[in-house]
Protein backbone atom coordinates (compact mmCIF):
# COMPACT_ATOMS: atom_id res chain seq x y z
CA UNK A 1 0.00 0.00 0.00
CA UNK A 2 1.50 3.33 -1.03
CA UNK A 3 1.69 6.46 1.10
CA UNK A 4 -1.13 8.23 -0.74
CA UNK A 5 -3.52 5.33 -0.17
CA UNK A 6 -2.49 5.07 3.48
CA UNK A 7 -3.06 8.81 3.93
CA UNK A 8 -6.55 8.45 2.39
CA UNK A 9 -7.39 5.57 4.72
CA UNK A 10 -6.20 7.53 7.75
CA UNK A 11 -8.13 10.65 6.71
CA UNK A 12 -11.40 8.78 6.21
CA UNK A 13 -11.03 6.85 9.47
CA UNK A 14 -10.08 9.99 11.38
CA UNK A 15 -13.22 11.71 10.07
CA UNK A 16 -15.55 8.95 11.26
CA UNK A 17 -13.83 8.75 14.65
CA UNK A 18 -14.19 12.52 15.11
CA UNK A 19 -17.91 12.31 14.29
CA UNK A 20 -18.32 9.45 16.78
CA UNK A 21 -16.56 11.43 19.52
CA UNK A 22 -18.41 14.65 18.72
CA UNK A 23 -21.83 12.98 18.90
CA UNK A 24 -20.87 10.73 21.84
CA UNK A 25 -21.64 7.51 19.96
CA UNK A 26 -18.20 5.91 20.08
CA UNK A 27 -19.43 2.55 21.41
CA UNK A 28 -22.29 2.36 18.92
CA UNK A 29 -20.02 3.13 15.97
CA UNK A 30 -17.44 0.68 17.30
CA UNK A 31 -20.06 -2.10 17.41
CA UNK A 32 -21.32 -1.29 13.92
CA UNK A 33 -17.80 -1.13 12.48
CA UNK A 34 -16.96 -4.47 14.13
CA UNK A 35 -20.07 -6.00 12.53
CA UNK A 36 -19.06 -4.65 9.11
CA UNK A 37 -15.52 -5.99 9.56
CA UNK A 38 -17.01 -9.41 10.37
CA UNK A 39 -19.00 -9.26 7.14
CA UNK A 40 -15.84 -8.48 5.18
CA UNK A 41 -13.89 -11.27 6.88
CA UNK A 42 -16.57 -13.91 6.30
CA UNK A 43 -17.37 -13.03 2.71
CA UNK A 44 -15.76 -12.11 -0.59
CA UNK A 45 -16.93 -8.50 -0.31
CA UNK A 46 -13.46 -6.94 -0.22
CA UNK A 47 -12.56 -8.68 -3.48
CA UNK A 48 -15.83 -7.59 -5.10
CA UNK A 49 -15.42 -3.95 -4.06
CA UNK A 50 -11.82 -3.80 -5.27
CA UNK A 51 -12.50 -5.65 -8.55
CA UNK A 52 -12.33 -3.67 -11.78
CA UNK A 53 -14.71 -6.19 -13.37
CA UNK A 54 -17.56 -5.08 -11.07
CA UNK A 55 -19.34 -1.89 -12.12
CA UNK A 56 -19.60 1.14 -9.86
CA UNK A 57 -23.39 0.67 -9.71
CA UNK A 58 -23.00 -2.90 -8.47
CA UNK A 59 -20.46 -1.80 -5.86
CA UNK A 60 -22.86 0.94 -4.80
CA UNK A 61 -25.60 -1.68 -4.41
CA UNK A 62 -23.37 -3.86 -2.19
CA UNK A 63 -22.49 -0.90 0.03
CA UNK A 64 -26.17 0.09 0.25
CA UNK A 65 -27.01 -3.40 1.57
CA UNK A 66 -24.44 -2.84 4.33
CA UNK A 67 -26.18 0.40 5.31
CA UNK A 68 -29.44 -1.26 6.36
CA UNK A 69 -28.20 -2.04 9.86
CA UNK A 70 -26.13 1.11 10.42
CA UNK A 71 -26.70 4.37 12.26
CA UNK A 72 -27.27 7.60 10.35
CA UNK A 73 -23.68 8.73 10.80
CA UNK A 74 -22.24 5.49 9.47
CA UNK A 75 -24.73 5.50 6.57
CA UNK A 76 -23.57 9.02 5.67
CA UNK A 77 -19.95 7.91 5.94
CA UNK A 78 -20.55 4.96 3.61
CA UNK A 79 -22.34 7.23 1.14
CA UNK A 80 -19.35 9.58 1.03
CA UNK A 81 -17.06 6.64 0.33
CA UNK A 82 -19.32 5.51 -2.53
CA UNK A 83 -19.63 9.05 -3.95
CA UNK A 84 -15.85 9.40 -3.97
CA UNK A 85 -15.46 5.92 -5.49
CA UNK A 86 -13.34 4.63 -2.61
CA UNK A 87 -15.20 1.33 -2.19
CA UNK A 88 -11.98 -0.62 -2.68
CA UNK A 89 -10.59 1.04 0.46
CA UNK A 90 -13.65 0.39 2.63
CA UNK A 91 -12.25 -2.64 4.47
CA UNK A 92 -8.89 -1.03 5.35
CA UNK A 93 -10.74 2.13 6.38
CA UNK A 94 -13.02 0.15 8.70
CA UNK A 95 -10.00 -1.65 10.21
CA UNK A 96 -8.34 1.71 10.80
CA UNK A 97 -11.52 3.13 12.37
CA UNK A 98 -11.69 0.10 14.67
CA UNK A 99 -8.08 0.63 15.81
CA UNK A 100 -8.66 4.35 16.41
CA UNK A 101 -11.83 3.69 18.41
CA UNK A 102 -9.95 1.17 20.54
CA UNK A 103 -7.42 3.90 21.35
CA UNK A 104 -10.20 6.39 22.12
CA UNK A 105 -11.91 3.95 24.50
CA UNK A 106 -8.65 2.70 25.96
CA UNK A 107 -9.89 -0.85 25.35
CA UNK A 108 -6.67 -2.36 24.11
CA UNK A 109 -6.64 -6.10 23.57
CA UNK A 110 -4.67 -7.67 26.42
CA UNK A 111 -3.11 -10.82 25.00
CA UNK A 112 -2.15 -13.41 27.59
CA UNK A 113 -0.08 -16.36 26.39
CA UNK A 114 0.28 -19.40 28.63
CA UNK A 115 1.52 -22.97 28.19
CA UNK A 116 -1.84 -24.45 29.31
CA UNK A 117 -5.41 -23.19 29.48
CA UNK A 118 -6.23 -20.97 32.45
CA UNK A 119 -9.15 -21.26 34.83
CA UNK A 120 -11.56 -18.31 34.96
CA UNK A 121 -10.07 -17.22 38.31
CA UNK A 122 -6.54 -17.29 36.90
CA UNK A 123 -7.65 -15.30 33.85
CA UNK A 124 -9.25 -12.67 36.07
CA UNK A 125 -6.16 -12.42 38.27
CA UNK A 126 -3.78 -12.11 35.30
CA UNK A 127 -6.12 -9.62 33.66
CA UNK A 128 -6.09 -7.43 36.80
CA UNK A 129 -2.29 -7.70 37.08
CA UNK A 130 -1.88 -6.75 33.42
CA UNK A 131 -4.17 -3.73 33.74
CA UNK A 132 -2.29 -2.54 36.83
CA UNK A 133 1.28 -3.15 35.61
CA UNK A 134 0.64 -1.78 32.11
CA UNK A 135 -1.45 1.18 33.34
CA UNK A 136 -4.48 0.32 31.22
CA UNK A 137 -7.88 1.54 32.43
CA UNK A 138 -9.67 -1.35 30.73
CA UNK A 139 -9.22 -3.83 27.94
CA UNK A 140 -10.30 -7.05 26.34
CA UNK A 141 -8.70 -10.34 27.33
CA UNK A 142 -7.42 -12.47 24.46
CA UNK A 143 -6.00 -15.82 25.55
CA UNK A 144 -3.39 -17.75 23.55
CA UNK A 145 -1.95 -21.15 24.39
CA UNK A 146 1.67 -21.77 23.41
CA UNK A 147 3.31 -24.87 24.93
CA UNK A 148 6.75 -23.63 23.83
CA UNK A 149 6.85 -21.10 26.69
CA UNK A 150 7.02 -24.14 29.05
CA UNK A 151 5.32 -22.34 31.96
CA UNK A 152 4.46 -18.92 33.30
CA UNK A 153 2.85 -16.31 31.06
CA UNK A 154 3.48 -13.53 28.55
CA UNK A 155 1.23 -10.47 28.48
CA UNK A 156 1.11 -8.10 25.48
CA UNK A 157 -0.95 -4.92 25.46
CA UNK A 158 -0.52 -1.49 23.91
CA UNK A 159 3.01 -2.32 22.68
CA UNK A 160 4.10 -3.30 26.19
CA UNK A 161 5.18 -6.78 27.28
CA UNK A 162 5.40 -8.62 30.59
CA UNK A 163 7.32 -11.84 29.98
CA UNK A 164 7.23 -14.14 33.01
CA UNK A 165 7.61 -17.33 30.99
CA UNK A 166 9.94 -20.17 31.89
CA UNK A 167 11.35 -19.99 28.34
CA UNK A 168 12.37 -16.35 28.91
CA UNK A 169 13.85 -17.12 32.33
CA UNK A 170 15.90 -19.98 30.85
CA UNK A 171 17.08 -17.70 28.04
CA UNK A 172 18.15 -15.01 30.54
CA UNK A 173 19.95 -17.63 32.63
CA UNK A 174 21.74 -18.89 29.50
CA UNK A 175 22.85 -15.33 28.64
CA UNK A 176 24.27 -14.85 32.16
CA UNK A 177 26.31 -18.03 31.84
CA UNK A 178 28.04 -16.80 28.68
UniProtKB/Swiss-Prot annotation:
InterPro entries: ATP_synth_OSCP/delta_N_sf, ATPase_OSCP/dsu. It is a peripheral membrane protein. Its main location: membrane. It comes from the Bacteria. The keyword Ion transport applies. One of its GO terms (cellular component) is plasma membrane. It is found in: Cell membrane. Keywords: ATP synthesis, Cell membrane, CF(1), Hydrogen ion transport, Ion transport, Membrane, Transport. GO terms for molecular function: proton-transporting ATP synthase activity, rotational mechanism. F-type ATPases have 2 components, F(1) - the catalytic core - and F(0) - the membrane proton channel. F(1) has five subunits: alpha(3), beta(3), gamma(1), delta(1), epsilon(1). F(0) has three main subunits: a(1), b(2) and c(10-14). The alpha and beta chains form an alternating ring which encloses part of the gamma chain. F(1) is attached to F(0) by a central stalk formed by the gamma and epsilon chains, while a peripheral stalk is formed by the delta and b chains. F(1)F(0) ATP synthase produces ATP from ADP in the presence of a proton or sodium gradient. F-type ATPases consist of two structural domains, F(1) containing the extramembraneous catalytic core and F(0) containing the membrane proton channel, linked together by a central stalk and a peripheral stalk. During catalysis, ATP synthesis in the catalytic domain of F(1) is coupled via a rotary mechanism of the central stalk subunits to proton translocation. This protein is part of the stalk that links CF(0) to CF(1). It either transmits conformational changes from CF(0) to CF(1) or is implicated in proton conduction. Belongs to the ATPase delta chain family. This is ATP synthase subunit delta. It comes from Streptococcus agalactiae serotype V (strain ATCC BAA-611 / 2603 V/R). The lineage of its organism: Bacteria, Bacillati, Bacillota, Bacilli, Lactobacillales.
Amino acid sequence: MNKKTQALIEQYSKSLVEVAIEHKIVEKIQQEVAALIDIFETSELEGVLSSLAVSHDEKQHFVKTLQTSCSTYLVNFLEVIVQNEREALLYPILKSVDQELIKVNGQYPIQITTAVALSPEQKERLFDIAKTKLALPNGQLVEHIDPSIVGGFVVNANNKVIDASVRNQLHQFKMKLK
